[in-house]
Amino acid sequence: MHTKNLFYSRTQQITQYLSALLMMVILTRTSISSAYPLFAQQGYENPREATGRIVCANCHLANKPVNIEVPQAILPDTVFEAVVQIPYDLQLKQVLSNGKKGGLNVGAVLILPEGFELAPPDRISPELKEKIGNLYFQSYRPNIKNIFVVGPVPGQKYTKITFPILSPNPANNRRAHFLKYPIYVGGNRGRGQIYPDGSKSNNTVFNATASGRVKKIIRNQKGGYEIIINDGSDSNEVVNLLPPGLEPLVSEGESIKLDQPLTSNPNVGGFGQDVAEVVLQDPSRVQVLLFFFASIILAQIFLVLKKKQFEKVQLTKINL
């Protein structure tokens, strides 16, 4: 009986250990390989709020520029480029989740008007394929064809991201019209500062959770620090944990206040959003416009010829 209980206890311990190990692997892979698109997709049905704010800004707190370039006008059922630029200093290094320094990744979310979608591979020209490179565009939702995310990808290689877009044809799509449409984009470089559950990453400032005097600063073997704050009473101590990659600004014996920064801000990245407009042009209107321009040019030519003919007649009368 004792042997059976011991076997059951050991089995339970091994199961718990393997479960914890598996969870750590999943979390580690998630945070590295699919951080920002995954967080947005899991937490929000639509990446653009009613206020116009793109939800990526909830985790990436710093504001940085992002630009999008599209043609001014396009014809129905036509493939065109939407070029997203995410500029930053390529020499910068960020704090990684393990506390080490590394290069910045970039990512983007593109919100197209309804009816616009990603161009199928057989419609993409070789020149456009070369601009796209090895990027993989993922639908924000399986049933949504006009919102796409890409990344994280190495920023050293992809500060410019080219999306191949296929315009709708109002003749086949009743929801499409010959109008001016907005295209929204959000792009970030670097890791976020806040996780979806509200907890901080090691890529942001950590503040004191209590006022008092710094009693002790302990450096952990696996990285990070424990800052022990005494609030004035002998028995009440508050421990502030700093994750790996952050260095304390305070020292032992120093008096600090509530919410005082314990670290500097390590973040070198940020998020930004932009909007561009594209006109879905009616081909018949283009033909009418071309005919109008051609008629004006012909009228000008006939006017010049008529003027020269009149001058010849006048010159002949003078000679007579």
UniProtKB/Swiss-Prot annotation:
GO cellular component: chloroplast thylakoid membrane
Signal sequence extent: 1-35
Bound cofactor: record note: Binds 1 heme group covalently.
Keywords of this entry: Electron transport, Heme, Iron, Membrane, Metal-binding, Photosynthesis, Plastid, Signal, Thylakoid, Transmembrane, Transmembrane helix, Transport
Binding-site list for heme: Y36, C56, C59, H60
GO biological process, one term: photosynthesis
Predominant place of localization: plastid
Gene3D superfamilies, sorted: 2.40.50.100, Cytochrome f large domain, Single helix bin
Annotated compartments: Plastid thylakoid membrane
Membrane topology: Single-pass membrane protein
Transmembrane segments: 286-306
An example molecular function term from Gene Ontology annotations: iron ion binding
Record's keyword annotation contains Heme: yes
Database matches in SUPFAM superfamilies: Cytochrome f subunit of the cytochrome b6f complex, transmembrane anchor, Cytochrome f, large domain, Rudiment single hybrid motif
Cofactor: heme
Recorded superkingdom: Eukaryota
PROSITE patterns: CYTF
UniProt family annotation: Belongs to the cytochrome f family.
Known partners and oligomeric status: The 4 large subunits of the cytochrome b6-f complex are cytochrome b6, subunit IV (17 kDa polypeptide, petD), cytochrome f and the Rieske protein, while the 4 small subunits are PetG, PetL, PetM and PetN. The complex functions as a dimer.
PANTHER family noted in UniProt: CYTOCHROME F, PTHR33288
Role noted for this protein: Component of the cytochrome b6-f complex, which mediates electron transfer between photosystem II (PSII) and photosystem I (PSI), cyclic electron flow around PSI, and state transitions.
Protein's name according to its UniProt entry: Cytochrome f
Lineage summary: Eukaryota, Viridiplantae, Streptophyta, Embryophyta, Tracheophyta
Gene: petA
